[in-house]
A protein has these predicted regions:
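N-terminal basic, amphipathic alpha-helical segments
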Residues: 1-92, 101, 286, 296-303, ...
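Active-site PLP attachment segment
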Residues: 36, 255-290
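Conserved core of the PLP fold type I
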Residues: 99-230, 242, 248-260, 330, ...
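Helix-loop "lid/cap" segments that line or gate small-molecule binding pockets
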Residues: 116, 280, 308-315
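Residue-level detector of anion-binding/catalytic polar loops
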Residues: 176, 232-233, 383-384
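Catalytic cores of nucleotide-enabled group-transfer and carboxylate-activating enzymes in metabolic
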Residues: 251-252, 292, 310, 341
């Protein structure tokens, strides 16, 4: 190679520029420096480098917007207190400017865990220490940590129908699982015993999609099952439990547990907004040491900025006020959409199952159409429907079709038009009208 000075003069550039270029080539192994002799090029002729074509920019399909979307993960967005949330974000930047630059504790920031513990004490009768609470970006992440902690030798039980995603997460971790049928009182304990499962996942306060509330007699049977063998546990998913329109909240299993066997799970994605990927689990004291010893190397997956903001949103009372506001809104939505169905041709060919809780109900329609035909017709009519079978692994064809009507995201002024279009999907309604 020419000397640095010679090459600099030849290219009319500074010698420092050439020196930096030579140094980079030397670091990458293309040239070597020999004392008092200069730079020599390494023999790399045996390596052929093929020029790669520029990566094609593939268009990303935007999520389709429907005239009516009854999917279960939709909520009313226009009621979110954005101005309050924005103000708290600004205050978080001001108050916690130094903490925001530090590593987030693996369980989550203390302020949020303390706020959640206080909320659970006041609204769920749960006596929880902040050290028992683990914050994560979505329940899927937290379920993954539990599956990993329990290990492949542990068999899980899942309600049928129920939260199918838990089965998918179990499969991805290589954990075996069993589906357990439900009856009018919830998960059937005799079938759970027969399954040989070690850990059961269920939603006793508001089963999805049926809305069944597990009565105290069935709860006592469940506690008998879990207390019979030391390695058994219950994962209680309290999703959507805030929206109960009559009476007080349903007491969680965690609050009734005397043997430290219940793991409590909940999320803010339904009560606030889906984009706020903050969920939490409460570990019973007997599992806390095990989690800390085996899972503490995982970093917290939620930014401290969002955690501090949510902590203030809860501790200053905004969260509870928002829940009360949304309960009133969803109660009115439920009333309007049920009234619209009763006033439509659907009333003559359908039966409604609703439990005065959550943001959905079940609508069974007596039709000659198959579910596949209804799905196809609905999409053509710009409607996204949710079917009861979507939450069951049993794909056996039944008479008629059963819909899960999640009305949270249906705009109030569109309800009449939405039900009219839903009715038009079924030829039986057209004959009535």
């Amino acid at each position: 190679m020419p000397s640095k000075r010679t090459l600099a003069q030849h290219l009319s550039v500074g010698i420092i520029t050439v020196a930096n270029a030579y140094a980079q080539l030397a670091v990458e192994g293309y040239i070597t420096s020999r004392e008092k002799k200069g730079y020599f090029v390494e023999d790399v002729s045996s390596y052929r480098v093929r020029r790669k074509a520029a990566a094609a920019m593939l268009p990303e399909a935007a999520e389709r917007e429907y005239f009516a979307d009854f999917k279960a993960n939709r909520i009313s967005l226009q009621n979110f207190p954005l101005a309050t949330w924005t103000r708290l974000m600004r205050e978080t930047l001001s108050v916690h400017n130094e903490e925001l630059l530090k590593t987030v504790p693996y369980k989550g920031v203390y302020e949020l865990r303390k706020a959640v513990a206080d909320y659970l004490a006041h609204n769920r009768a749960m006596q929880v220490d902040p050290s028992q609470i683990i914050i994560g970006a979505g329940t899927e992440y937290l379920y993954g940590r539990l599956l990993q902690m329990f290990g492949h030798a542990c068999t899980f039980a899942i309600e049928e129908p129920g939260y199918k995603k838990f089965a998918s997460i179990s499969a991805s971790f290589g954990n075996p699982w069993k589906y357990i049928p439900i009856d009018d009182n919830g998960l059937m304990i005799d079938k759970l015993e027969e399954s040989g499962a070690d850990v059961v996942h269920l939603s006793p306060a508001n089963h999805f999609p049926t809305g069944i509330v597990m009565p105290v007699t069935r709860r006592l049977e469940l506690f008998e099952w879990v207390n019979r063998i030391r390695k058994r546990y219950i994962i209680e998913d309290d999703y959507d439990s805030e929206f109960r329109y009559t009476g007080r909240f349903i007491l969680p299993l965690y609050a009734q547990d005397t043997q430290s066997r219940v793991i409590y799970m909940n999320t803010f994605s339904k009560s606030l907004v889906p984009s706020l990927r903050i969920s939490y689990m409460v570990l019973p004291p007997r599992l806390l040491d095990r989690y800390e010893q085996t899972m503490s190397f995982y970093s917290c997956t939620v930014s401290s900025f969002e955690q501090y903001t949510l902590a203030r949103f809860i501790s200053e009372g905004y969260f509870e006020r928002h829940i009360n506001k949304m309960k009133n809104y969803y109660r009115e939505q439920r009333h309007k959409i049920l009234a619209a169905i009763h006033a439509s041709p659907l009333a003559a060919i359908s039966q409604i199952t609703e439990r005065n809780a959550g943001t959905h109900f079940v609508l069974h329609i007596n039709t000659r159409l198959t579910e596949a035909e209804v799905r196809k017709t609905a999409l053509a009519a710009d409607m996204c429907l949710s079917f009861y079978s979507d939450y069951s692994h049993n794909t056996e064809e039944n008479n008629g079709c059963t819909l899960v009507i999640n009305y949270a995201a249906i705009e109030a002024d569109k309800i009449a038009a939405v039900i009219e279009r839903l009715s038009s999907l079924f030829p039986e309604c057209n004959q009535i009208s």
